[in-house]
Design a protein with these regions (language model features):
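N-terminal amphipathic, basic-rich helices that act as targeting or association modules
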Residues: 2-84, 243-262, 275-281
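Cofactor-binding active-site loop characterized by glycine-rich and histidine/acidic residues
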Residues: 45-166, 320, 338, 342-343, ...
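Non-catalytic terminal/interface segments that mediate subunit docking, oligomerization
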Residues: 69, 281-396, 401-411, 468, ...
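Long, well-ordered, tryptophan-enriched scaffold segments
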Residues: 178-324
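Structural signature of the thiamine diphosphate
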Residues: 221-289, 412-417, 436-486, 614-630
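Glycine-/acidic-rich phosphate or pyrophosphate-binding loops and their flanking alpha/beta elements
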Residues: 263-266, 298-299, 308, 319-334, ...
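Peripheral docking tails and interdomain loops at the edges
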Residues: 302-316, 424-426, 446, 571-630
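Generic long, charged, amphipathic alpha-helical segments
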Residues: 364-365, 518-551
Length: 630
């Protein structure tokens, strides 16, 4: 990488403030080179960050963190913020075990005002800070940086509505690149398109300039407006949706023109009440492959800089996500009742495969998990077979809809939870470890988890043939590598599969932990310990008959789950055994995620730290059998 003229001297925002606009432009080039170089090795959110380099520099040039608060919605576009707030030298450790988080993290830096990872939270948090500031008689600026994709989330609208009513001094920077991960959908996206293209500006008053000149700080605002993309018409006085909500609207401004950005931010600081600054950026700017395919470089693994091609293992098994997408597509080929629903993640969930074949039966509702689930309930009530594919961590946002709109009415909705379990580099905001617990407590819910990618096919067919609420959860990444059946059978509801018989102890494992149980049983056999293995298949209902039999015949059971122990599958087994007064005959140990938020890092290292790797489980099982536990 070429020698840096300015970047190597940037150790805090104070160093950014010393630079002129031409120097900042050079710094932006150097930062882009660093982003491309590091992320090509570590993986990460490349395209979003390439698009906000100038914007982030302008924010830190104008505002004074940590006194002023800058909140990045989702936070995946905060890499530049990290680089210029004292973490430049650590940046090569991004998303690595023990290294920098890929998202803002309050414990990582005083400049990270608010931790983020999920969408559409920034305006609410910023408003809360502004209220706290005023109540405590303090004086600082609060800025929320939110993408147009996040603006499809209902929470953002709730916050805008409340902020306009409270009229607190705060700034919302709308980073408009026409993308979230996939192409944005919804009325707000259409509205922003009209703002970008100037189709709704016929109501602009001729006397705006005179009005501004007569108001306090008006000349500064006018100076900024004149730099806005196009002309003064882009100030929507009392006509834009943001003005109707009580915001002063400034924009759109070119998000890669530093002079324009600096001027508009300075002006926004001086306006009383909430301000919306509309910034137009290009996702992936500065790296041609990312500009041409911004969705592919939204979140990427390691890649070759010269070609932009991802560095992958050609021998890796097919992913669970792909198996899901292809299976659902094939099932829909012969059943026109099936519909697929996603919340702005068609590629991430595999529903892009389904959408290509069944366009009219595919619905991308935007970043709106609660709406997605209730819309699915409505479809089910009207006779369809909806499948809502949403990441496990994001499904948390739809909990009330699952309970109130699906399960209370016993509607036939299939919830497919991708990225269940530990996801690795994205860390605790994205680990999908709570779904067993939060779904198991809901009456009428059936919960399945496949031991491998082939069983996922059978479970999906089972779910669609079952008349009631069903959830199927499966992990991120490649499958186990088993052969895929071409004909699928319904699995008996609530029945487990005995994979291995033993005498001394039995593993009751579910989902991704079944293979770990089999491997641990092999290690135990080498020590003269005979271990059975059960593939639970169902977290709810349990195979009560088999469980009672094993409690009496083995006398020792170990549960394995890639989810939290509190309220999880192990808890379900303990509850059942206790209810049947079998805990006096059977000793149980539960292995899973402890009561903590798990950090980011390579999954193998995280499993080792949690004691969920095969050698540790085998060692603990041996000690359990021998009565040698510490």
């Amino acid at each position: 990488m070429a020698e840096n003229k300015f970047l190597d001297k940037i150790n805090s925002p104070a160093d950014v403030k010393k630079l002129s606009v031409p120097q900042l432009e050079q710094l932006a080039k150097e930062i882009r080179q660093l982003l491309i170089s590091v992320i090509s090795h570590t993986g990460g959110h490349l395209a979003p960050n390439l698009g906000v380099v100038e914007l982030t520099l302008a924010l830190h040039k104008v505002f004074n963190t940590p006194e002023d608060k800058i909140i990045f919605d989702v936070g995946h576009q905060a890499y530049i913020h990290k680089i210029i707030t004292g973490r430049r030298e650590q940046f090569p450790t991004l998303r690595q075990y023990g290294g920098l988080s890929g998202f803002p993290k309050r414990s990582e830096s005083e400049h990270d005002a608010f931790g983020t990872g999920h969408s559409s939270t920034s305006i609410s948090a910023a408003l809360g800070m502004a209220c706290a500031r005023d109540l405590q008689g303090e004086d600082y600026n609060v800025v929320a940086v939110i993408g147009d994709g996040s603006m499809t989330g209902g929470m953002a609208f709730e916050a805008l509505n409340n902020a306009g009513m409270l009229h607190k001094n705060m700034i919302v920077v709308l980073n408009d690149n026409e993308m979230s991960i996939s192409k944005n959908v919804g009325a707000m996206s259409e509205y922003l398109y009209q703002l970008r293209t100037g189709e709704t500006y016929n109501k602009i008053k001729n006397d705006i300039e005179g009005w501004l000149k007569n108001m306090e700080f008006g000349s500064d605002v006018l100076k900024a407006i004149r730099r806005l993309k196009g002309s003064v018409k882009y100030l929507m006085v009392l006509t834009s949706i943001f003005e109707e909500l009580g915001f002063t609207y400034l924009g759109p401004v070119d998000g890669h023109d530093l002079e324009s950005l600096l001027d508009v931010m300075q002006a926004a600081k001086k306006i009383d009440g909430p301000v919306m600054v509309h910034v137009l950026t290009k996702k992936g700017k500065g790296y041609k492959p990312a500009e041409e395919s911004p969705n592919k470089f939204h979140g990427t693994g390691p890649f070759d800089i010269a070609t932009g091609k991802k560095i992958t293992n050609p021998n890796a098994p097919v992913s669970y996500t792909e198996v899901f997408g292809k299976t659902l597509t094939k099932l829909a080929d012969t059943d026109d009742k099936i519909v697929g629903i996603t919340a702005a993640m068609p590629d991430g969930t595999g529903l892009n495969i389904f959408a290509e074949a069944h366009k009219d039966h595919f619905f991308d509702v935007g970043i709106a998990e609660q709406h997605a689930v209730t819309a699915a309930a409505g479809m089910a009530a009207a006779g369809m077979k909806p499948v809502a594919a949403i990441y496990s961590t994001f499904m948390q946002r739809a909990y009330d809809s699952i309970m109130h709109d699906i399960c209370m009415q016993k509607l036939h909705v299939t919830l497919c939870l991708d990225r269940a379990g530990l996801v690795g580099d994205d860390g605790y905001t994205h680990h999908g470890v709570f779904d067993y617990a939060y779904l198991r407590s809901i009456p009428n819910m059936t919960i399945m988890a496949p031991k491998d990618e082939n069983e996922l096919q059978h479970m999906l067919k089972t779910a669609l043939d079952f008349d009631g609420p069903v959830s199927v959860r499966y992990p991120r990444g490649s499958g186990v590598g088993v052969a895929l059946d071409t004909q699928w059978q319904d699995l008996p509801i609530g029945k487990a599969e005995v994979l291995r018989t033993g005498k001394d102890v039995c593993f009751w494992a579910i989902g991704s932990m079944v293979q770990t149980a089999l491997d641990a049983a092999e290690l135990l056999e080498a020590q003269g310990i005979s271990a059975g293995v059960v593939n639970m298949r169902f977290a709810k209902p349990l195979d009560v008959e088999l469980l009672r039999e094993h409690a009496q015949s083995y006398g020792k059971i170990i549960t394995l789950e890639e989810g939290v122990l509190a309220g999880g599958v192990g808890s379900a087994i303990l509850e059942e055994l206790n209810e049947n007064k079998l805990l006096e005959q059977c000793d149980v140990r539960c292995f899973g995620i402890p009561d903590e938020f798990v950090m980011h890092g390579d999954k193998k290292l995280l499993f080792r730290d949690l004691g969920l790797d095969t050698p540790t489980i085998a060692a603990k099982a041996a000690a359990f059998v021998k009565g040698e536990e510490e």
